[in-house]
Amino acid sequence: MQELEERIQSEGTVKEGDVLKVDAFLNHQCDVRLFDRMGSAWAAHFAGKHITKILTIEASGIGIACVAAQHFGNVPVVFAKKAQSINLDGDQYTTTVYSFTKQKEFPVIVAKKYLNAGDHVLLIDDFLANGKALRGLINLCEAAGATVEGIGIAVEKGFQGGGDTLRAEGYDVDSLAIVESMNPETGEITFRH
């Protein structure tokens, strides 16, 4: 998605440790118009799929997923919680994921009543690095017996291999911008096309 690549080039900052900071428009301050165009792009890509639910992980994927849901007939959006809460009652699906950004493992939880065997799920997230967060969402879907119809990603760090691994496993991964390389010294960002 050219517009997203341009925003990354003009407003993104490359940090040490393979970190790409895009908080001006994606995961701190949210450009809802951009999110809308991202949702439209995913709707075009996944047009042949019967999506009944969107699943993401808190927190940065929530805004993108909610706006994207409008392009899929306003299907429900479920977000996996990263911690146990008194608001989560009853049966739940739980798995553990490793966060590249936070450099730690944490549990992710979805109430069983919100993820079912009949669901055809589109996974959406802001970033895809090594694929650990998505692997956790896939595990939750498998536990529920839900079908993963596809994966929509705003920014994939292609050099970290998570997207390539998921594609090799047969998942339909649509990343709107794939960063091929980043240089924290020069700030240079190159994209895969």
Curated annotation (Swiss-Prot):
GO terms for cellular component: cytoplasm. It comes from the Bacteria. Belongs to the purine/pyrimidine phosphoribosyltransferase family. Xpt subfamily. Homodimer. This is Xanthine phosphoribosyltransferase. GO terms for molecular function: xanthine phosphoribosyltransferase activity. It is found in: Cytoplasm. InterPro entries: PRibTrfase_dom (IPR000836), PRTase-like (IPR029057), Pur/Pyrimidine_PRTase (IPR050118), Xanthine_PRibTrfase (IPR010079). It catalyses: XMP + diphosphate = xanthine + 5-phospho-alpha-D-ribose 1-diphosphate. The keyword Cytoplasm applies.
